[in-house]
């Protein structure tokens, strides 16, 4: 181990508490570790300093590394030292007496170099000059030397062998030494007996000393000195062998003659350092002489005699004289020696001066050199440290995530596995988020009261039920779009500019300059015109239900972009952000997916794949997002978001300010405590001064008082400064919120917040410190406000823009959604390449490691650099191949627990660009995400692979239990069964109403074939007025279907080169489907052919006379026969249904005189005008039903010239229609009601003068569209729903969209009336419904005939036309249900039996029922029924009444609830506010169980008006007029309105939440 400052160096041991994973600094040179860099740095500097010396050679001025190397070399040299020489050399060393090691080394080397010892290996030069390596066996002395023979040592006196170092007999020693020197044997005289070391040479030989030599460098002066340093040490100034070496080699027991046959040498004696400068030998001799003299004198004294004393004195005198002479000689010699010695000393001194000067210069140079080296070392360390700091700085910089070398493995998320295909799960979430954000704007709760969940959306996309949630979703989208477009058209009409201005604006927008946009708009306009040409109304006016939905959706997609015209250019530019045709999402769908639109023309939307359904929903969402109302909605929420963020920032700033104030208050309190302590000390000092003053004189007292005054003033000044400081802080606190409040004045919703913070600021300054409970309450209040603002911000973000939380290293997006809980991961590889997903090494790290390899070992972990320029440039220089894109499907995953979230946050890298931002966001939103994960259900998003019994969500809408299960058959089959039912139903109503008959040989066979699905039995030819007309004729284009391409020019070319082929189908339709569609379309065509022309009205009211142009009816027929899907046939059926004048049916006959439908047995029909007349109402009365033709007084032949023309007839007919649509089912009234009826007749006579067209519009079965302008959500809703036989309708369930249900036929045993009085769905059509459902017919096997019943009043009877020969003219009736037609004798018997059972009871109770006042019967009002009552939909009586009230000119005060902002005291006076929109919503939701509840709400509305508004105000006057109108309309419906109804009103439900 090297010596530090010539002392042993001890290494620093590792700390005892060192952890295995702790990062330390390692010093390689000393093999030590340090926790702190400063200690490591000091040890490195120390190791590089020249303060070390070699422990073996003793060489000083070395670094630690140099000392180690010196020790290593020295030990290697010692290993090569000849072993046979070790003991002889140590023995010889014990004979020396020297104070310096090099002197001993010179003596021993001079003696040993020419002598060779036993067992030593030497080289022998043979006679031929060759060198032979041999081992010495024996040393032979010269032959003349006595005492030695043959190398054996004789026994000699020990004094001659061992040199004694004692001073007992110096004279003998000196003489002996002198003798030995003289007798020393020349070493060249010795001979040596040697033996070769090679095995083949075994003979020994005797050689001379001149023939022997040692190998070169085997024994040298340096090796000997190095060896002696290891075994010697100074003792009392003399170099002696170490005791350990003496004991190890047993030197005291050795005999020199064993090694060499000669006397031991006598070496020169060198005095110890402590006696240097004195002649020790002379002193030693004089002392011996004195001893001898003393002994001589003592002997002489013992023999003293006088004589001998005298002789002795003489001899003494001689000896003294001789001594004096001797002393003189010695003195002379001494003087000469001293002189010589002085000269020698002078020479030595000069030499020493030179040596010292040289040493001084050397040391100075060495010092300068060491200084320069140390400076270089320091500079080197500083540079290393600077590089290290720069390295850390570069390593800590953010970088590309895949360049980080310390990436941890992310926790594996669970893949989403639902019923939906993985590729459309993201789009499903988009639709769900859209409905969640904008559902309130478009009244989503009308279609989905419980909201849309992921399970409902899955069922809509995966299922094929035509009555399922997909139908509801599409109905919601289409009605919302139609309503919004209608509202925008009204606004455009109001704000329309002149033609010139519009033209200028169009040119400015440069819309017409693009031929592609113009062509697309033209094609869309053609598609938009198709419904008007072939169905007689616009697309928005078509009947929208589950059956026609597919075709109307297709037509809407084709017509997208048609509303982009030059007339609304300004409106689009100002309100819709410059919207043009290419911005329409449906047009983009038509251009990008022409096959989907083509498939929709022949396939039902319910049978599309989930991906195709999702594309349609995606396009409809995009369409809604471009609307003005949606844009305004988003802008409102942007303002709300901005305001909420501002309030949140102010709340945070307020919290920070309070924290600063509290900290300042604590500091102020500490300062006050210090001042109090100082005051206390000053008081104590003053007390001491007072005591001193009492002892001292008066002068001293005055001085003490002055000092005390000085102290008092200093304290007072400090107090005043403190008070001023406090006042300044108070004024700042008071000024700050005031100025802040002034800066934000006028911001609504923030005044309360500002007042609250200002009050808190004042309280903080003025009141005492808050207690712990108050502080906790204040903290909770702040947390509550913060939570409310965060929720407000999140809800606003959901309605404006949803961003992902961030992305990780693999570019995966992380999402949280307001609509569904959980943390979702989207793996979207679009736009990525394979090299982007692989780890990338950094060139910076490589460069730094190559320049300084020690840096990496000093850091605790591998470092990473930022630069990637070299890597990026490398492939460009050496490779032309481009990176490959990633082809992986889009995949969604999720984390389901907070533990996985914590693992994710821990694994994200804080140095990556993407992951650092994601980690920060996750930490901020952790509480919100954990709250969502607590509500997360993993089973919904990851189905197990095991088959589940039935995981589909139950989406029942009130279907009958015995109806067919739609999940067991495709939607096409469902629609086919439904269409057959509708065709049979409309044919039966036309036939029973004597409006016509199908032109076939046997009607029963035709119906049986249609009902059983044997379409081949239907006629393949169509007869029109007896002329055979083939099915395929020249037809017009119904479907605008172009073969589009991706490029716009190709799209345009495809549009221009298209040739119209058929009306509505394409060649790719499967033959099986097309045959069914063809047969059913042909059946509908036959039904239309059988209707008499005079019973058709617009749009299919064209006559059969020859015309030069095609009418709507002609185009309708052509389109029908070219239908490619069942939905298209349904659409044509709807148009036909609303074109039939159902009021002319005998099923709806009403007495022209008394305007009542009752007593059908005593009613006859006029053969001229087809109006009904009671036999007892005609003047004169008819006692019997006349035979043959009968004409009313106005139509008698003699007055035929006075009959109204066909153009005027609808005015009278429509008068009946108004009553049909407004009237109830029961006309039983007492005398008071008959008086009211006469007033009603007078009112209707006045109304007869109005335009007939307007009244016809009310009776059209088009769900009130477009003539009755309702909100879109009421379209297609029937007023009542019926319970099927054997099943009670569940409350809260919605009736089936196309279910055919019937009223119960149970007859009350007490009253003989039906248990439930049913309002007919459309009053203009028959009230007959099928009793047996389709599934019942199929399950019973044999084909059964249908039994029809009609909902009638007890006195309603009529006679049948003579053409209806299969119906008994006087068939008995149920009290409320009458059999219309039967098909077999079995049915006739069963119906007749049932009729006879109730005939007597009905007849006996008829009169008493007539005298009784009608009680309101409970009715079941459906919100909207998708089932067709005869194939059409109409408003219920209540809905129509509400619509009439809304359309009235005096309804303006009652349309909506009074605004509390505009009229603050209204709700203080009116406790039960209500308006027409509330009543209409309750009607739509079927909340009215009794008619009296409906009347009570209406009367409550009027009473509120009269209670708040004085009678002379315009609101009260409007209320009076509207109330009178309501009473008249209610009496028409048979509703008994009395003022007492107002008192019976129950508390109305809460008003509908207003739309933003």
Swiss-Prot record:
Role of this protein: Regulatory subunit of the ATP-dependent ACF-1 and ACF-5 ISWI chromatin remodeling complexes, which form ordered nucleosome arrays on chromatin and slide edge- and center-positioned histone octamers away from their original location on the DNA template to facilitate access to DNA during DNA-templated processes such as DNA replication, transcription, and repair. Both complexes regulate the spacing of nucleosomes along the chromatin and have the ability to slide mononucleosomes to the center of a DNA template in an ATP-dependent manner.
Subcellular location(s) per record: Nucleus
Source species: Homo sapiens (Human)
GO CC terms: ACF complex; CHRAC; nuclear chromosome; nucleus; pericentric heterochromatin
Name of the protein: Bromodomain adjacent to zinc finger domain protein 1A
Keywords (A to Z) from UniProt: Bromodomain, Coiled coil, Isopeptide bond, Metal-binding, Nucleus, Phosphoprotein, Transcription, Transcription regulation, Ubl conjugation, Zinc, Zinc-finger
Region (Disordered) location: 662-754, 841-877, 941-966, 1202-1376, 1399-1431
Coiled coil stretches, renumbered: 306-397, 634-709
Phosphothreonine sites (modified residues): 731, 1547
Glycyl lysine isopeptide (Lys-Gly) (interchain with G-Cter in SUMO2) crosslink residues: 952
Biased composition (Basic and acidic residues): 662-695, 715-726
Start-end of Acidic residues biased regions: 703-713, 727-736, 1213-1258
Region (Required for interaction with NCOR1): 1-133
Expression sites by tissue: Highly expressed in testis and at low or undetectable levels in other tissues analyzed.
A family per Pfam: DDT
Region of interest (Required for interaction with the CHRAC1-POLE3 heterodimer. Required for interaction with the CHRAC1-POLE3 heterodimer), residue spans: 1-128
């Amino acid at each position: 181990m090297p010596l530090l400052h010539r002392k042993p160096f001890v290494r620093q041991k590792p700390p005892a508490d060192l952890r295995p994973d702790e990062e330390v600094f390692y010093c390689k040179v000393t093999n030590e570790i340090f926790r702190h860099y400063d200690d490591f740095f000091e040890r490195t500097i120390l190791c590089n300093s020249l303060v070390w010396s070699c422990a073996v050679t003793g060489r000083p001025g070395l670094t630690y590394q140099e000392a180690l190397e010196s020790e290593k070399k020295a030990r290697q040299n010692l290993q090569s030292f000849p072993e046979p020489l070790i003991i002889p050399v140590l023995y010889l060393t014990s004979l020396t007496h020297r104070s310096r090691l090099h002197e001993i080394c010179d003596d021993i080397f001079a003696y040993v170099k020419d002598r060779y010892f036993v067992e030593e290996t030497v080289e022998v030069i043979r006679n031929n000059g060759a060198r032979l390596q041999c081992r010495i066996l024996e040393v032979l002395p010269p032959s003349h030397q006595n005492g030695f023979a043959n190398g054996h040592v004789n026994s000699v006196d020990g004094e001659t062998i061992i040199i004694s170092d004692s001073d007992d007999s110096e004279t003998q020693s000196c003489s002996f030494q002198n003798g030995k020197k003289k007798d020393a044997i020349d070493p060249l005289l010795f001979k040596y007996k040697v033996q070769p070391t090679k095995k083949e040479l075994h003979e020994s030989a005797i050689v001379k000393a001149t023939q022997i030599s040692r190998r070169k460098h085997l024994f040298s002066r340096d090796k000997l000195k190095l060896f002696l340093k290891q075994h010697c040490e100074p003792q009392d100034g003399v170099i002696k062998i170490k005791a350990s070496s003496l004991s190890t080699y047993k030197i005291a027991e050795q005999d020199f003659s064993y090694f060499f046959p000669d006397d031991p040498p006598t070496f020169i004696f060198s005095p110890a350092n402590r006696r240097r400068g004195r002649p020790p030998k002379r002193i030693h001799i004089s002392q011996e002489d004195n001893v001898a003299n003393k002994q001589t004198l003592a002997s002489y004294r013992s023999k003293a005699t006088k004589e001998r004393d005298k002789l002795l004195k003489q001899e003494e005198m001689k000896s003294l004289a001789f001594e004096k002479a001797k002393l003189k000689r010695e003195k002379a010699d001494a003087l000469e020696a001293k002189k010589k010695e002085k000269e020698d000393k002078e020479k030595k001194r000069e030499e020493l001066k030179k040596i010292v000067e040289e040493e001084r210069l050397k040391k100075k140079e060495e010092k300068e050199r060491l200084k320069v080296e140390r400076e270089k070392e320091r500079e080197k360390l500083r540079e290393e440290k600077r590089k290290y700091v720069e390295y850390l700085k570069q390593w800590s910089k953010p970088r590309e995530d895949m360049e980080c070398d310390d990436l941890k493995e992310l926790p594996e998320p669970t893949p989403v596995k639902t019923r939906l295909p993985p590729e459309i799960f993201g789009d499903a979430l988009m639709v769900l988020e859209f409905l969640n954000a904008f559902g309130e704007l478009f009244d989503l709760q009308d279609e989905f009261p419980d909201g849309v969940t992921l399970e409902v959306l899955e069922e809509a996309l995966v299922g094929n039920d035509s009555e399922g949630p997909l139908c509801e979703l599409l109905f919601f989208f289409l009605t919302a779009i139609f309503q919004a477009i209608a509202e925008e058209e009204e606004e455009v009409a109001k704000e329309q500019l002149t033609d010139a201005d519009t033209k200028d604006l169009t040119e400015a927008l440069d819309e017409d300059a693009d031929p592609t946009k113009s062509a697309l708009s033209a094609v869309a306009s053609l598609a938009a015109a198709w419904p008007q040409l072939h169905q007689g109304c616009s697309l928005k006016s078509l009947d929208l239900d589950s059956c026609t939905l597919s075709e109307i959706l297709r037509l809407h997609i084709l017509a997208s972009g048609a509303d982009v015209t030059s007339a609304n250019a300004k409106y689009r530019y100002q309100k819709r952000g410059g919207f043009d045709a290419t911005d329409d999402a449906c047009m983009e769908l038509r251009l990008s997916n022409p096959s989907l639109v083509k498939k929709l023309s022949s396939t039902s939307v319910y049978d599309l794949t989930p991906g195709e359904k999702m594309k349609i929903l995606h396009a409809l969402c995009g369409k809604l997002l471009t609307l003005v109302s949606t844009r305004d909605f988003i802008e409102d929420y942007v303002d709300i978001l901005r305001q909420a963020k501002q309030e949140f920032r102010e709340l945070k700033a307020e919290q920070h300010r309070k924290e600063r104030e509290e900290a300042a208050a604590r500091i102020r309190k500490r300062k006050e405590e210090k001042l109090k302590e100082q005051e206390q000390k000053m008081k104590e000092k003053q007390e001491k001064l007072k005591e001193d003053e009492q002892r001292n004189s008066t002068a001293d007292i005055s001085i003490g008082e002055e000092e005390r005054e000085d102290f008092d003033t200093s304290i007072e000044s400090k107090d005043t400064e403190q008070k001023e400081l406090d006042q300044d802080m108070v004024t700042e606190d008071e000024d700050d919120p005031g100025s802040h409040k002034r800066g934000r004045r006028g911001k609504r919703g923030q005044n309360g917040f500002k007042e609250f913070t200002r009050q808190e600021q004042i309280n903080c300054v003025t009141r005492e410190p808050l207690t712990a409970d108050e502080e906790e309450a204040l903290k909770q209040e702040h947390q509550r406000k913060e939570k409310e603002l965060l929720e407000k911000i999140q809800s606003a973000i959901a309605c404006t823009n949803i961003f992902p939380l961030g992305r990780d290293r693999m570019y995966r997006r992380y999402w949280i959604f307001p609509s569904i809980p959980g943390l979702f991961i989207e793996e979207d590889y679009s736009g990525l390449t394979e090299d982007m997903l692989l780890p990338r090494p950094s060139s910076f790290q490589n460069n730094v490691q190559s320049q300084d390899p020690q840096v990496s070992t000093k850091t605790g972990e591998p470092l990473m650099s930022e630069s990637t320029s070299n890597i990026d440039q490398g492939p460009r220089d050496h490779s032309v191949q481009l990176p490959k894109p990633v082809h992986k499907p889009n995949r969604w995953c999720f984390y389901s627990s907070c533990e996985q979230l914590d693992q994710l946050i821990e694994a994200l890298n804080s140095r990556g660009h993407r992951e650092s931002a994601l980690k920060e966001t996750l930490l901020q939103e952790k509480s919100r995400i954990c709250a969502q994960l607590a509500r997360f259900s993993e089973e919904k998003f990851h189905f197990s692979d095991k088959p589940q019994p039935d995981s589909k969500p139950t989406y029942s809408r009130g279907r009958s239990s015995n109806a067919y299960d739609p999940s067991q058959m495709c939607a096409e089959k469902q629609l086919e069964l439904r269409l057959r039912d509708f065709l049979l139903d409309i044919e039966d109503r036309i036939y029973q109403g004597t409006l016509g008959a199908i032109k076939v040989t046997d009607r029963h066979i035709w119906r049986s074939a249609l009902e059983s699905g044997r379409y081949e039995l239907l006629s393949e030819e169509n007869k029109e007025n007896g002329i055979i007309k083939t099915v395929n004729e020249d037809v017009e284009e119904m479907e605008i279907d172009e073969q589009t391409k991706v490029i716009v020019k190709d799209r345009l070319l495809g549009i221009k080169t298209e040739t119209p082929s058929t009306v509505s189908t394409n060649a790719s339709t499967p033959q099986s489907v097309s045959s069914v569609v063809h047969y059913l379309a042909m059946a509908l065509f036959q039904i239309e052919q059988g209707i008499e022309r005079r019973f058709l009205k617009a749009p299919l009211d064209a006559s059969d006379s020859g015309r030069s142009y095609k009418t709507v009816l002609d185009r309708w027929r052509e389109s029908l026969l070219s239908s490619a899907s069942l939905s298209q046939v349904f659409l044509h059926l709807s148009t036909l249904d609303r074109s039939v004048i159902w009021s002319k049916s005998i099923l709806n006959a009403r007495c022209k005189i008394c305007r009542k439908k009752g007593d059908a047995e005593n009613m006859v029909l006029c053969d001229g005008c087809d109006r009904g007349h009671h036999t007892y109402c005609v003047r004169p009365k008819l006692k019997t039903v006349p035979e043959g033709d009968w004409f009313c007084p106005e139509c008698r032949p003699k007055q035929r010239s006075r009959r109204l023309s066909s153009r005027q007839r609808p005015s009278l007919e429509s008068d009946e229609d108004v009553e049909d649509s407004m009237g109830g089912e029961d006309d039983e009234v007492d005398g008071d009601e008959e008086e009211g009826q006469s007033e009603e007749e007078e009112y209707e006579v006045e109304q007869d003068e109005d335009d007939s067209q307007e009244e016809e519009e009310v009776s059209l079965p088009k769900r009130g569209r477009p003539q009755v302008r309702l909100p879109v959500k009421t379209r297609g809703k029937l007023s009542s729903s019926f319970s099927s036989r054997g099943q009670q309708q569940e409350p809260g369930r919605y009736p089936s969209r196309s279910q055919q249900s019937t009223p119960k036929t149970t007859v009350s045993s007490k009253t003989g009336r039906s248990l439930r009085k049913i309002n007919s769905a459309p009053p203009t059509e028959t009230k007959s419904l099928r009793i047996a459902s389709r599934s019942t017919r199929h399950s019973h096997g044999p084909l059964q005939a249908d039994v029809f019943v009609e909902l009638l009043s007890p006195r309603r009877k009529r006679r049948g036309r003579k053409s209806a020969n299969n119906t008994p003219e006087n068939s008995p009736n149920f009290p409320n249900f009458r059999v219309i037609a039967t098909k077999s004798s079995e049915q006739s018997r069963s119906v007749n039996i049932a009729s006879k059972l109730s005939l007597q009871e009905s007849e006996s109770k008829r009169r008493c029922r007539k005298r009784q006042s009608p009680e309101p019967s409970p009715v079941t009002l459906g919100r909207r029924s998708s089932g067709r009552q005869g194939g059409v939909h109409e408003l219920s009586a209540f809905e129509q009444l509400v619509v009439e009230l809304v359309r009235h000119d005096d309804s303006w005060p009652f349309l909506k609830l009074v605004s509390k902002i505009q009229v603050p005291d209204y709700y203080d006076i009116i406790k039960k506010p209500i308006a027409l929109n509330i009543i209409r919503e309750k009607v739509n939701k079927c909340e009215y169980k009794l008619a009296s509840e409906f009347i009570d709400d209406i009367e409550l509305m009027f009473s509120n008006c009269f209670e708040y508004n004085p009678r002379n105000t315009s609101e009260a006057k409007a209320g009076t007029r509207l109330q009178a109108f309501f009473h008249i309309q209610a009496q028409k419906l048979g509703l008994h309105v009395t003022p007492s109804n107002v008192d019976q009103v129950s508390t109305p439900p809460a008003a509908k939440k207003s739309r933003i």
